[in-house]
Amino acid sequence: MDRPLRLLAWVNLFLCLGLYAAAVALYFVNQPAPAWRQTIDLEVWNLSVLAILFPTVGLLIVVNQPRQLLGWLLGIIGLITAITVLATQFAIYGFYTQPLAHTLPAVALWLRSWLWIPIICLVAFFMLLFPTGRLPSSRWRWLAYGLLLTTGALTVINLAGLAHLPTDFTAEPALTSPWERITGPLLVSFPLLLLMSLSSLLVRWRRADVLVRHQIKWVVFASVMLGATLFLGDLVVEQIWQDPTVRIVVGRGLIALGFATVVIAILIAVLRYRLFDIDLIIRKTLQYRCV
């Protein structure tokens, strides 16, 4: 019964690797890049953590616990990120490197304009469901519904047009969305929802035993690091470095470091503090193979 789920997890990982490899290949084809495109080009590298490491850790969880939702969340985050990175590089290729007459570059640009939204939603859901794969209690359903509604609304707004793409990414005039006026409040609500999801970990920590507290504390630390790099990284970098290129590289590097700390925290919880008992399963498997 669980074998198809394990197979699907492997397929997802290889799909992520293939899409990301194609994006990297297009990245080198698209070089050299003008100054305005440096931030976009660096997405290939700073999003590699999401596109490769997240589905890898997700596979580790799903192979041993096929019905554990947290593993699938990591795998889906990786897949959406890989699609986003590839779409970005293909759009650059189709608009600038080798201008194409058909609509595929525009479709790729359109995908880039809204795929980031479900990524943030899934990261928030991961924090909300960690470490059991379920809500802390039924009282937290309102937060899950809020995440779904906010994600759905922002996705619909961005699906309706390309109003929020960088103006220097394409020479074509951006389409405007009829619901653009409500985008601001929705974007402000996203960080608030993320903080509320993080607060659920603190609630779990207070109620948990010693072992579960160890599992949670690493993910809380990593989540705080990620939030700091996402929302404060650019501000700090601007105060230290004057060179725009250095700012971009260091700022995006900090974001990649933030995502990497999340992966490391999950691995510590899984392997060091027996989350899902995966360490025991791996140890027994190795002992069986040695015998």
Segments the model singles out, each with a brief description of its role:
Residues 1-291:
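Alpha-helical transmembrane segments of multi-pass integral membrane proteins
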